[in-house]
Amino acid sequence: MSLLQKTGPATLRAEKVLWRGGRVLSPTSPAATALIAEGDRIVWVGLDDEAPAADQTVDLDGALVTPAFVDSHVHLLGAGASLIGLHLADLPSAAAVLARVASFAASVPADGIVLAGGWDETAWADPTPPAAEEVERAAGGRLVYLSRTCGHTGVAGPRLLAEHPELAALDGFDASGVLTRAAHRAARAVLQTAVPVAQRLITARAALAHAASLGIAAVAEMAIPNAADPLTEAEFQGLIALGAEPDLPAVYGWWGELAAAEKARDLGAHGCGGDLSADGSLGARTAFVREPYRDADTLGAQYLTADDVAAHLLDCHRIGLPAAFHAIGDGAVQSVLDGLDLVEPALGIDAIRHARHRIEHAELLDSALIARMVHHGVHASVQPAFDAAWGGADGMYAARLGRERALAANPLSKLAGVGVPLAFGSDAPVTALDPWGGVRAALLHRNPVSRLPAAAAFSAATRGGWRALGRDDAGALAPSQRANFTVWDLTTGALPDLSDPRTPDPKCSMTVAGGRLVYSRA
């Protein structure tokens, strides 16, 4: 009988389980064919014929077992909506976007809302976004907001603007309906209030179940609170609670509010910040850069000063939480590092390094900025799929920044080479939940100089995620490590060669998170 015939989610209930007859990717036992998990820990790794007694045995049928993935940057509601709701990615034109919106809106009650994202004009022959009036017409007159794929700009229907005149007073408002900055975030939040928390959690559950099917044992949820949506706190607590359910990956929540560490702690957050934005995105031309954009006379948007960053860091250290900042442009990264410099005399470098603060995205960096990240012990939570989607000499980054700066973006090898710890994520729904895709993108970075070797890329997608969460007892298949592992449809004893575009991604057979079977293909 095969592994999947003999084992299913209902049968993995013993406290001490022997997984045998496979190829176990272990740093302590390179020839290992078996492991034992007891509760949420791995207690033994070795050869089949040397295995101690266990309460239950699972035959791996020669399958490869590796550490499970961690997605270090997700938005579960958006990720779930991209799976079971209206999603506008991979469409060839504004007309196609409007057609999909119209088709979806036909099933929505007349007093309902249409809230979606994912459109990307840089992939269209005519890069003109749909007009506000067109969007509202496609939505059948309903309140509507369509976010761009980056999540930093979007198009609001005229009715939304008319019924919420307070949006006009916010930074980033434009009467055309194309909103950025604070106006964009508020418009999205205003519509989100119409969605009950229970419905939001159904959507998030779909994302977590899908993550488990991809070999992901844990995710870092990046909450973006907004005063326009009073349900955000209940939603956030519900997302963390989902991660404690026995059939889902773990959820580590980041509360993205400035200098709100006490609130974050009380809500159950792992850290304060995350998608606490020091800038915006390159696609929206709101990433804060030190030299102007190539295609617009702007440096982007600076949302946080060094003083803001310093105040946030001091607040986090007072409560005992790590901090994280969204910073894409080199100007934003500099602001974060300047803030770290400001607090170093008061906190001491050892305390700063011990906290494992993070920069999310960290796309535009020079050697001096990287050296300062090393000094402060900052972890880089990066998305290799961004380079695959928009990098290179002729991609969207080149259009925004010019060829030279585009090719210098996402310098993964430089970061890893000098000791900046890397953690891979997707930023789903900005790019899809796809951990092997992220590993492949790191191996095939559009600038060969920035590519990572396979072992380093896989480590960043697994152990690196745990290290960035302050968990040194997870991410490796060795005794005393947490039992987070995945069984793949491979019978080789090594990782696949994803640098060859012809090599298919491995398929997940089982995912174990904290000793719990959260996915089985049976």
Locations of regions flagged by a protein language model:
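Conserved, mostly hydrophobic/aromatic
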Residues: 157, 215, 280, 326, ...
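His/Asp/Glu-enriched, well-ordered alpha-helical/loop segment
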Residues: 202, 314-324, 331-357, 362, ...
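Short, Lys/Arg- and Gly-enriched loop/turn segments at beta-strand edges
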Residues: 492-499
